[in-house]
Structure formats: C-alpha cells, structure tokens
From Swiss-Prot:
GO MF term list: ATP binding; hydroxyethylthiazole kinase activity; magnesium ion binding
EC number: 2.7.1.50
Pfam hit, one: HK
CDD domains: THZ_kinase
Record protein name field: Hydroxyethylthiazole kinase
Organism for this UniProt entry: Desulfotalea psychrophila (strain LSv54 / DSM 12343)
Main function: Catalyzes the phosphorylation of the hydroxyl group of 4-methyl-5-beta-hydroxyethylthiazole (THZ).
Keyword match Lipid biosynthesis: no
Amino acid sequence: MSNISLTAAENLQQIRENKPLIHNITNFVVMNYTANVLLATGASPVMAHAQNEVEEMVAFAGSLVLNIGTLSESWVSSMLMASQRANTLKTPIILDPVGSGATAFRTASAKRIIAEAKVSVIRGNASEILSLGSEQSNTRGVDTSQSVSDAAQTASLLARELDTILAITGPTDLVTDGRRVFNVDNGHPLMPYVTGTGCSATAVVGAFAAVDRDYLRAATTALAFFGLAGEMAGKAATGPGSFMIHLLDALYNMSPEQLEKGCRIKESSATRS
C-alpha cells in the first residue's frame, strides 16, 4: 500500500480515538445530516452560529467548518468572528463556498472570508472553486458545470494565489496546494442525489484536518474515506433514500484497514504557468 493509503488509515484511527470537536457554522438544510456524518466518522459535532458564542466555542474545537449554503449578513459576521479567533488559535478553517458564482452575495461573501481569514482548505465543486478566482465560471445553482480535469490547471494557480488547499469534488476529486496534486477516484453515482453529501464531505475534511496538520494530506484522505463509504453504501442501496442511511452505516463501520485497502489516490505534479 502507498504511504498516503497508510496515512488515511492512521488519520481515521486518530479520529476514532480522539473524537475531535468540529465547530460547524453551516446551513439549515444539512445541519442534521452533517452532524450525523461526523458522529458516524468518529468526531464530535457542534453547530453554533450565534455571534454571542462563536469565539468561545471555536476555542474548544479541533477545526472550524464554514458553509455558506443558507447565507445572511449576520451569519457572515459570525463566520468572520469565529475565523479570526481560529486563526489566533491556529485552528484549521475549512470553507465550503456553496453556490459561489451563482449570486453576487454568495461570491462576495466567500471572497471576503478568504480575504479576512487564513483558510486552510476550500472544498467545493469545480464551478464554485473557479468562481473564487479572476476567471468567472458558469455556476448553475449549486451544481457543477465544469469537470475536475478542466479545473486542474486553474485550481493549481488559484491555490498558489490564495495560499490554501483546494479540494474540488466530482466524479474524480482533485486536491492541490498549487505544487502537488492528488486525484481521488473513490465515490458512487448516487452521492449527488442526496442533499448534504457535499457539505458533509467538507465537514469530514474538518475532522481529518483536526488530526493531521498537513492539510493537503488531510483533505485527500478525508475525501477518499468519504468516497469509499459511498461505494460501500451504494452496494446496499436501492435509491437515494436508502443510500443516505447506508452511507451513515458505512462511515461508522469502516475500519482503518478497509480504508487503507480501498482508497484510490494518485499523486501528480501541479501544472506550472
């Protein structure tokens, strides 16, 4: 097995043993499912978005996960307050720019968070990620309209520009810091048919980042774990409804050894310009 496969197994074992607290400021649509995904993974979720407590709450957390799915000005303020405290504490921040590129408010809010806080990982689909750069992409709501392969070169440049890790999910996931690129081939076709799978994947990245401070490695192994769980769930599911339940079971039941054997991760060099 490759070193990254072994790291994936070790990261999962660390999550199960340490149960890191993951502070989520996330959207109403996915709060319940995201919390259950984190619990099934082995982490401890907390959903806290009130400005009165976010700075205090993030001090207990192993990572901070920000999701702009159901956005308002007050939530942006909460995210910025929590982010600044997280930066002071050197706590990793994971951003999910849901629907960035679809509306000016979403795009501006995502860019503001990136500008005012040091974000460790940005996880989104290709269109969302590319909307954060100078080239505008064609975002249809929260669905991807650009392939991961089409986004690879731009993502590498954008990762270096923003000095962050970009995790672009699709049929094949791409994770890059602008210098190294990992492709993750785990996943299942039913995953896009369940609301919250992408947002939950972001939260799982937060769990892995809480135990592995090499955030490129953490994001890559997190997506492999989540994708492999999707494959396991797909074998038992008959449609999106049963898949959602089986995914929780697969996350909970997967052993580190199964992850080491089942993850499909390839590394390549980032394209330079």
